[in-house]
């Protein structure tokens, strides 16, 4: 079985295939978080606001307590894309990062901070400081505007997964991805003879576990536990793929082996999520947990891009 990361430059999509199965699908912006040497072309002194030219014919809005003159060069980062008739928003307090550290130009006295769950890495710490100084020194050069650093999510993803091959493809014509996208449209999804129903609501996500057509000669309690156990990885795989977070309630088949089931859940959830909290079973027999949100669900993203 093959594992690799992929990119579709046309759809600005990227993600990972693990053992010939879609693990995640994301989308990136070609401008958001890029760092530029921009040129001040206008200003409003009363509100410390500046209008910057950051690319050919492209302007952005910057608010800064630091004073600039028209014609000055400013090192800044796009933090909000242009939308309808509104200009993009830039910040002089740029953020740079690698897989271990992140750094803001002005916060924390300009020193890198270790990312949650990462181990100290002297080489990556120094690399970030060197990059910061290099970017700041760019204010002294010409011409402006100039793109200095692309810093979209795809770049960071490639850095994080540098041990995997990067494959360029068309997500619409790749069978693994297109089949997964079709699945995401459905609430009821199957794993062999078993199934789950995913209802992703505004306030929570409710998942119903079904044995469907599966038959067994096992004791009923053992059979229900086995069905629940067999679906644990399938449930968290689909929550991760669909990028569903927040409160999650799972209606497992009723079994007396809930403690064993919680142990299995703890083993499996770590493969897909870093930040979560397990509350356990309620008096009504429903299993509750919360997962840290990571932006819009994949279903909403696909709908916005008219891919479903």
Name these PLM-found stretches.
Residues 50, 82-84, 94-104, 192-308:
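Conserved glycine-centered short motifs in functionally critical loops
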Residues 33-35, 65-75:
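Short nucleic-acid-contacting surface segments enriched for D/E, G, S/T with interspersed K/R
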Residues 12-13, 46-52:
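Short aromatic-glycine-enriched beta-strand elements
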Residues 1-34, 79-203:
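Extended, charged alpha/beta regions that create polyanion-binding interfaces
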Residues 30-31, 43-44, 67-69, 189-190, ...:
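Conserved catalytic network of the ASCE P-loop NTPase/AAA+ motor domain
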Residues 50-54, 76, 88:
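SH3/SH3-like beta-barrel fold
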